[in-house]
Amino acid sequence: MAEKMALAKAINESLRRALDADPKVLVMGEDVGKLGGVFRVTDGLQKDFGESRVIDTPLAESGIVGTAIGLALRGYRPVVEIQFDGFVFPAYDQIVTQLAKMHARALGKVKMPVVVRIPYGGGIGAVEHHSESPEALFAHVAGLKIVSPSNASDAYWMMQQAIQSDDPVIFFEPKRRYWDKGEVDTEAIPGPLHKARVVREGTDLTLAAYGPMVKLCQEVADAAAEEGRTLEVLDLRSVSPIDFDAIQASVEKTRRLVVVHEAPVFFGSGAEIAARITERSFYHLEAPVLRVGGYHAPYPPARLEESYLPDLDRVLDAVDRSLAY
């Protein structure tokens, strides 16, 4: 049955469903229990499932992830919350040297069904450590799945799939979209976790994005349509692995590609996409692959945030430059 709900509520309902279905599923993190999380994504879960299933932890991200690894080795499926994107770095060692490598290190004999939830990105007027987009730092690490939903339906179903995965999943939640509402069919049959989806058909140029930038790309496509240009919008959904086949298929139709993400353009995921698509589809391209993202600079104070983040004008400028070739 379909129900309209906010993206944050969709994650809450997905966690609730997983906790109810499997006693081995646990939710852990700073203030996830009594408070229900800073963004109230876990609101009510501790009340309904108890303190042994929804666990308030100390302020120690390394310890949170390390504990989750140990629980996974004992057959549990922990879902841990990192309160803000910039707080994940104390746990980076545990994620990179242990969580990502445990399965290969044990020659496939152990599973690592751990989900690391990270609210990420800007757009809420916060400061550094609260508004960053570090997904590329994790995409470089083999052994991790990295996903970011753009809408409530994907948030619900991608969380279900992440919890059911026997491999670790870094689940980046676009906090500026937490309150965006959409239809969620809790009885649907979802597609593969890593598959991209065309959310708008077009023939003149492909816009590829994930997480918070998908909505922006749809707004860009609306603006371009007023000038008679039809842009295809591709929601990548997964940063690692990336559905290069879907990008290639779209580009070989439109012959132009602009990749949009909040993370800095320098060494961002868009660089890998640009390189791969240039290798795969060079003779189909009528313009260089362009990228729009954050600047290679520390995240600015809130009053400068709008100047730092990709916006309608910056993406439209990239579209114009691509179509001018």
Regions found by a protein language model. Give the residues of each.
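Thiamine diphosphate
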Residues: M1-P168, F172, S307, ...
